[in-house]
């Protein structure tokens, strides 16, 4: 299976938000669970990486915790890839609320026509490491990189044979760049909730308990 797995990363310090962002709620449901429902339209296996796995015991997701602790996003990518069953794995952060399924399909097409170890979007001189695909064969490379004492995700990505989607091409799918929005503060979340579309939740298991 080439594109069967998606990973939602629920870790991070959330300093600016003031609380753990995996607890973001809309209509008394965890936002992360809404992500899982949307991604299930394209992926057979939805994996949540969280160091509080008990939160998701009643959900349909596969829930895992970092195997290599305190290494930032690379630790989450590492365990997500190890748990996945497909050649390529889609990664999303839990604070990215605007999933664009058409863009995910487009990235899959890019990797079908031009295989690489990752498919990542450029934004000016920056890159967007999530809302991206990574090859499952990166597990050993991540272990070597972290074992050598390195932590920087961006330095690691520069070492890969990567298919980069240009900002211009990505804006065909999201002219305002909303599909890469991160909810970093309470103000970000409240603004998004006021402006965003109404969200419907269907899985009772996703009801927030706190």
Swiss-Prot record:
Annotated catalysed reactions: Mo-molybdopterin + GTP + H(+) = Mo-molybdopterin guanine dinucleotide + diphosphate
UniProt-recorded Gene Ontology molecular function terms: GTP binding; metal ion binding; molybdenum cofactor guanylyltransferase activity
Binding site for Mg(2+): 95
One biological process term in Gene Ontology: Mo-molybdopterin cofactor biosynthetic process
InterPro entries in UniProt: MobA-like_NTP_Trfase, Molybde_CF_guanTrfase, Nucleotide-diphossugar_trans
Cellular component, GO annotation: cytoplasm
CDD domains assigned: MobA (cd02503)
Annotated GTP binding sites: 9-11, 21, 66, 95
Top enzyme class: transferase
Annotated domain remarks: The N-terminal domain determines nucleotide recognition and specific binding, while the C-terminal domain determines the specific binding to the target protein.
Entry function: Transfers a GMP moiety from GTP to Mo-molybdopterin (Mo-MPT) cofactor (Moco or molybdenum cofactor) to form Mo-molybdopterin guanine dinucleotide (Mo-MGD) cofactor.
Similarity comment: Belongs to the MobA family.
The protein's name: Molybdenum cofactor guanylyltransferase
Classification lineage: Bacteria, Pseudomonadati, Thermodesulfobacteriota, Desulfuromonadia, Desulfuromonadales
């Amino acid at each position: 299976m080439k594109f069967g797995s998606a990973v939602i990363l629920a870790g991070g310090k959330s300093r600016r938000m003031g609380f753990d962002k995996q607890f973001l709620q809309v209509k008394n449901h965890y936002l992360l669970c809404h992500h899982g429902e949307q991604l299930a339209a394209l992926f057979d296996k939805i994996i949540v990486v969280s160091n509080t796995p008990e939160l998701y015991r009643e959900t349909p997701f596969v829930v895992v915790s970092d195997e290599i602790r305190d290494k930032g996003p690379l630790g989450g990518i590492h365990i997500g890839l190890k748990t996945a069953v497909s050649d390529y794995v889609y990664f999303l952060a839990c604070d990215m609320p605007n999933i664009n399924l058409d863009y995910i399909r487009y990235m899959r097409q890019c990797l079908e026509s031009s295989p690489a170890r990752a498919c990542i979007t450029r934004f000016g001189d920056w890159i967007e490491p999530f809302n991206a695909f990574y090859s499952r064969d990166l597990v050993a490379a991540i272990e070597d990189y972290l074992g050598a004492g390195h932590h920087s995700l961006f330095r690691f990505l520069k070492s890969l044979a990567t298919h980069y989607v240009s900002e211009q091409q990505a804006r065909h799918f999201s002219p305002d760049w909303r599909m890469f929005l991160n909810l970093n503060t309470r103000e970000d979340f409240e603004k998004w909730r006021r402006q965003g579309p109404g969200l419907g939740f269907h899985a009772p298991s996703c009801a927030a308990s706190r």
